[in-house]
Amino acid sequence: MRTETEMLDLILQTAKVLQVNAVAMSGSRTNPKAPKDEFQDYDVVYIVEDLDGLIADLAWLEGFGKRIIEQYVLLDHRRLYLMLFEDGNRIDLTLCPKEHIKEWVDSEADFTVLDDPQGLFAPYAPTPKRYWTAPASETDFDKSCNEFWWVSAYVVKGIHRNHLIYATDHLYGNCQQELLKLLAWQVAVDKGTVDVGKNYKYLFQYFPSEKEKEFTALLDFSDQKKITKSLFATMDFFHKEAQAFSLKTGFHYDKETAEKMMEYAEERLK
């Protein structure tokens, strides 16, 4: 597998050959807190003068190495080329017209400039707090709790009808996301605005390992019985955390509605 130094040299040399105006990198490789491993992508942008000329003949992409798989994506005025190479490295390369550089900057939480002789990035600053969580207001908390318990009824319906994809989608995509949000707010109460990462990937760094194990145990959706078990455990987890959060902040928690919704689920699924 090519080293980071080799890959960055290749990225910069290719940019030089193509007469790219500026090069920057975003993603986990620009975050000192991110764990270092072989799965970190090279999220790179080439700021270019002539986008149409570059995409007219993409043979130059071969210079990055032999690809296992690739994907091309159109993003507003930009072109994104996702490439996984045989040696395990991956480059997510964005081609961005110079006049639309702000479009790329606004799409990224943080970035590091690798080459910018014209100073094109000078007017722009990274916004690393994009995935940070601030302390919740009482309205935020109330809306989150209402969303959790309301959508839990959809999960009950899906399980009862044996519509398992529907049930799982609402359980993980809504209820468990509200649980993760609540856990992030728990941290923010003590620490202020905190970096939980995209998709909460750093959240459990702020908790004892048992908390992550408790959440991970919810993620078996392989059959109807296990989805049902996950729903009840998710309800218990959320109810426990919401009460603790309410006690800590003084925010009102509608415990009566929560317990009625748990009874509703028990009556229909037990």
Question: What does each model-identified segment do?
Answer:
Residues 1-21, 26-39, 44-94, 99-101:
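Metal-dependent nucleotidyltransferase catalytic core
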Residues 7-8, 20, 55-57, 127-132, ...:
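Short amphipathic alpha-helical segments, especially helix-boundary/capping motifs
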Residues 35, 128, 199:
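Glycine-rich, flexible loop/turn motifs
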Residues 36-37, 105-107, 196:
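Short aromatic-enriched loop/helix-cap "lid" or pocket-rim segments at secondary-structure transitions
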Residues 38, 110-113, 202:
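Residue-level preference for alpha-helix termini and adjacent loops
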Residues 42, 64, 114-117, 186-188, ...:
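Surface-exposed loop/turn and secondary-structure junction residues enriched for glycine/proline
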Residues 63-166, 170-174:
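Conserved NTP/Mg2+-binding pocket subregion across the NTase superfamily
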Residues 132, 136-270:
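Conserved nucleotidyltransferase catalytic core and NTase-mimicking acidic/glycine-rich helix/loop elements
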